Structure formats: structure tokens, C-alpha cells
Amino acid sequence: MKIVSWHPVLTDHQSYTLEALQQAATCPLTVYVAKAEHPARQLQGWVNRHTASLSPQLIPQKGWFKYIVRQLRAHRDAIHLFGSPFEQPKLIVTLLLAAAMGLRVFLISEPYSPISAGYQNDRLKLINRAKAVLRPVLYRCYGALLSRRIAGVFAISPLAAIQYRGIGIAGKKIFPFGYFVPRSERLCSKTPAADSEKTGLKLIFIGTLIERKGLDVLIEAVRSLNRTELLVTLDVYGSGDSSQFDLDQAAVRYCGLIPFGEAQAVIADYDALVLPSRYDGWGVVVNEALMAGVPVICSDRAGAGAVVEKWQCGAIFASEDAPDLTGKLNEWLRAPESLAKMRLAARNAGAALDPDVAGRYMLDVLSFDTKQPAPSCPWYDYD
């Protein structure tokens, strides 16, 4: 087996999984990227720390079309993986060429956003509204071109699976997937301990300070719970303009950025992480929390919520519904012992989210005989 993986840019939550796949398959794995870095992610504090074994090759700016044709021809006998295939025009062209050449192609894809809120910022609102209208149309076109030509889709979240079925990809070609990061070495000697006499809730939010992330909904819920006394505190971490939110620096504090790679160690000191997104294709911060053994409350529009639901390591609330979120948090205030059980469940879920598990699962999918039952998903329930 030979594997070639194409990406707009390679980030840690993809590279760890590819390295695990390479180790599980004990085969050559070549990585091509359209960009070496993602400017928006860099502003958020992301750092690319690719393992030496991957050594991504940058697609040149000049002569890129001839370059990709040459690489596709040179790797005719390989399995071609396309991560976030519709994010970058060069990758779309490469994917269509690979499919037209009859190569064995798998997509690794989040769902497209069904809302108009910006993905990285809140600017260009009119353009974002137009994109929200056009996305379903574009994906139906992709489906018409690719449904019979690709071998499969690693669908990142149940919503991605639903969307790909909706554009004509056969259910037997869709394999549930996610994003994966390893457990921090700093946690090896740090086991979260529950305090049975402790009162109140200490919450953490990590994310870009934009409308899509739903921080305003979380702040409203915290304010509601603290009407008569200070029961809940919320620490907010992330890039963006904190002045647009109601942060009193008492119950709700802005704490700046977490140094890249330190999220799990920081999260471990909290009772729960909250991801109140209006939409999140996955939400890697959920992985970080579960790796740290910390329960998660997230909206029903966050892809990683499927993991929380299956492993019962937190709670799900209706997106944009502050009263529903308030009710879920209030249940934890009234029954703090439930958090202790959820911490254990979180650690179990975190173990399942290890990149090594994902790498072995990918290998099983790439190797399995379509006449046999598909490999079972280790992370969440899927029909």
C-alpha cells in the first residue's frame, strides 16, 4: 500500500493522525500542501509542529498545474486522501483530476457551514450570507461529479455524513471520523481530582471571539445563574475583540491566549469546558478537554458533541438557547457528584480519541473488503 495525502495546509490535528496511519500501515506516505501556514490560524496562536516523518511538500505557485499532474501520474498506484478538499482551488482541481484519472480517492471532510456567520471573523457579512446560500448548490455539483468516482469519505461528524449522503454519496462509502490530538505529556503526573465539598462551577471557554462561537449565549447563561449569588465563574480564552462581550472580570473574565500546546494543562484546572457554538464542524477543543479528563457542555451544532453524547461525558444543549444551557449548568450545580462520574467518562473518551486509534481505524477502512461489514466507529454512534 502507498498513500498520498493532499491538504490546503497541514495542521497538528491532521498530522498526528497521518503519522499514526503511516506507522500502522508501515508504508510510504507522501504529503502535499497548498500553503505552508494558515494566516488566520497563526493569529489565533496555532503553531505547525509537523513530525519529521511527514515532511510536507509545498505545491509551487508557478507551474502548479503541471506539478500536480506529474505527481498524480507518478502515484497512480497509491491511495489519495484529500483533506478539506473544497477549501482551496488548487486542491479542487487536483481532486477532480485524480477522480478523472480513475485513482483511488478518499475525502477527509468536515460538513459545510449551514449558517451565515463568518468562520474566522465577523467581517464581510454580506459575502458570508451569499456563501451560506451557495454552499449547498456547490456541494450538489461536487456530488454529481464525484459520487461514482471516489472510494469513500471520512466524514468529520454526523452532520458531514448526512450532507454527503444528501449530495449522492452512497452510505456504504461514508465512514465516520473526527479530528485527533495526543494527550499532553504535562498531564501524565496530573490527575484531576473531584472535591465533594466544593460548591459552584468553574467553567472555561476557548475559542475565537466571534459570533459563530456563541460566547454571548454562554455569558447570558452564566449571568442568569448568578442573579442572586456568585455560583458560576467563566474564564474566556481566545483571540479577538473581547470588548464586544459583557465581561465584568469577576464572574466572567477574559484571560487572553493559551500558549499553543498548553490547552489540556489549563483545562484540567476547571470543572467543565463549554463550547456554545452556533456552528462548529468538529471542535478540537472538545478533544483537549476530554484528554484532560474534563467534562464538556456543547451545543447541538458542534460536531464533537457526538462524542460527548455517546460517552456520556458531559451534556448537549440546543444551540443559541441560553435557557437550555442555563438548565444544564443548573443540574450540575444541584448534583456536583455527577461531575465526578463524567470526569471518568471523559478520560475514557479521551483515550478513544488518541491519534493512534484514528490511524488504525483509517487503515482498516482503506484495507477493508466492501463485501464485509464496514469497520465500526470508535468515537460516536452512526447509522
Show which residues each predicted segment covers.
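Donor nucleotide-sugar binding/catalytic pocket of nucleotide-sugar-dependent glycosyltransferases
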Residues: 132-192, 197-198
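Conserved donor-binding/catalytic core segment of Leloir-type glycosyltransferases
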Residues: 193-213, 219-222
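Nucleotide-activated donor-binding/catalytic signature segment of Leloir-type glycosyltransferases, i.e.
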Residues: 243-261
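Short alpha-helical donor nucleotide-sugar binding micro-motif in glycosyltransferases
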Residues: 257-258, 265-270
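Aromatic "clamp/platform" in nucleotide-sugar-dependent glycosyltransferases that forms part
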Residues: 278
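Short hydrophobic beta-strand element within catalytic cores of glycosyltransferases
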Residues: 295-298
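Conserved acidic donor-binding segment of nucleotide-sugar-dependent glycosyltransferases
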Residues: 310-311, 315-322, 331-336
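A short, well-ordered alpha-helix in the C-terminal region of glycosyltransferases
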Residues: 338-352
